[in-house]
Amino acid sequence: MAALPVLVLVLLLACGGPRAAGQKRKEMVLSEKVSQLMEWTSKRSVIRMNGDKFRRLVKAPPRNYSVIVMFTALQPHRQCVVCKQADEEYQVLANSWRYSSAFTNKIFFAMVDFDEGSDVFQMLNMNSAPTFINFPAKGKPKRGDTYELQVRGFAAEQLARWVADRTDVNIRVIRPPNYAGPLMLGLLLAVIGGLVYLRGSNLDFLYNKTGWAFAALCFVLAMTSGQMWNHIRGPPYAHKNPHTGQVNYIHGSSQAQFVAETHIVLLFNGGVTLGMVLLHEAATSDMDVGKRKIMCIAGIGLVVFFFSWLLSVFRSKYHGYPYSFLMS
């Protein structure tokens, strides 16, 4: 009977020993991975990864940290303009986190270039770039862990909101100082001051109705075409299909747009406006009847042509819209 407690103790040690050793080995592997990531982050805010690094540090357990990965194609022969623009914003976000007082080892920023890790693209069945995915500390990425680039754009502030939503890590985006705005404002003030100085005795140009009307028209066209949305969201200029090479300038959803789409809509609105101006001049001017007829026909043609195109763009974004005019 005295040997029974000793036997039980031996059995417990025999069962718990391997488990404890495995747990200790797991903690050592995790510590090595975190130390390696921290060392790379201290040198570069965005860690460049190939297939081996991605599988070992992002996919393979154990892991108690989240990794935000940008899948991109930055090599010049890929001709991915959007990738370069998105990379600049991603670098701003990663640098803001790296130099933040709240920096911890709970989240890291990484990048996989197609030419350095094409096997990773194949493993994830990924066929477009740039793409942002959050690999959480526990479990596999869910649907919300893939960033909706076409809807939100790639501005660092938008990425920071998405990161906060997926990881509960709030990053205050700090951009490098941009002196372009103050310089342009100073140049504008200098031009205005120069005009006032040179024509101080004659300021009739300030009361020029045509000039003010043209300036107001430019402002209205810019605002109605979606320039302010672009400024806030920072969408890509266009989207190039990596397989077919086809470039899309019109976004297929009503919830997003490309910068090129703004320029197209501005052009169409400008064409309609020009047509209306010609119709007004044809009806009110004192020119001979022949010229007024030409202006009237040209005005009607511009309004019909550009309005049809504008309605066609609207139909392509709002699927199921029943009305069209000349163009489907």
Curated annotation (Swiss-Prot):
What is the phylogenetic placement of the source species in the record? Eukaryota, Metazoa, Chordata, Craniata, Vertebrata
Q: Which pathway does this polypeptide act in?
A: Protein modification; protein glycosylation
Indicate the transmembrane segments per the record: 178-198, 212-232, 258-278, 294-314
Assembly description = Accessory component of the STT3B-containing form of the oligosaccharyltransferase (OST) complex. OST exists in two different complex forms which contain common core subunits RPN1, RPN2, OST48, OST4, DAD1 and TMEM258, either STT3A or STT3B as catalytic subunits, and form-specific accessory subunits. OST can form stable complexes with the Sec61 complex or with both the Sec61 and TRAP complexes.
- Cytoplasmic topological segments: 199-211, 279-293
Report the record's disulfide bonds: 80-83
Instruction: Kindly report every residue range on the membrane side named Extracellular.
Output: 23-177, 233-257, 315-328
Domain called Thioredoxin: residue spans: 40-168
Q: How does it sit in the membrane?
A: Multi-pass membrane protein
| Known role | Accessory component of the STT3B-containing form of the N-oligosaccharyl transferase (OST) complex which catalyzes the transfer of a high mannose oligosaccharide from a lipid-linked oligosaccharide donor to an asparagine residue within an Asn-X-Ser/Thr consensus motif in nascent polypeptide chains. Involved in N-glycosylation of STT3B-dependent substrates. Specifically required for the glycosylation of a subset of acceptor sites that are near cysteine residues; in this function seems to act redundantly with TUSC3.
Kindly provide the name given to this protein in its UniProt entry.
Dolichyl-diphosphooligosaccharide--protein glycosyltransferase subunit MAGT1
Query: What compartments host this protein?
Result: Cell membrane; Endoplasmic reticulum; Endoplasmic reticulum membrane
Where does the signal sequence lie? 1-22
The UniProt entry's sequence similarity note says:
Belongs to the OST3/OST6 family.
Q: What is its main location?
A: membrane
Enumerate the glycosylated residues: 64
Q: What keywords are assigned to this protein?
A: Cell membrane, Disulfide bond, Endoplasmic reticulum, Glycoprotein, Magnesium, Membrane, Signal, Transmembrane, Transmembrane helix, Transport
